[in-house]
Amino acid sequence: MKYRPLPFYLTIKKSKIHGLGLYSLAKIPKDTTIGMTHIEVGNDLIRTPLGGFINHSEEPNCERKLHNNRWFLKTIQDIDRNRELTLRYSMYKP
């Protein structure tokens, strides 16, 4: 399997929120796991390319889920083509 820093249905482009952001190239259904954003190593977090470009929103369309010391990005609603993926920033464990 070839490594891809981003899924084929995402791209990075200028964001209206801040700097660059993650945008959908196709419709993404609710409850889709997009990929890994961070890895916990001891008390440290290592950010992946996916985690480096998602912007904060008070009304996000994605959330983070922790599984085996890895944080994954998951959609919490359907995301239409050309829409920016957003996350409410919080690295605290639930």
Please place each PLM-identified region on the residue numbering.
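Conserved catalytic SET/PR domain of SAM-dependent protein methyltransferases, capturing the structural core
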Residues: 1-94
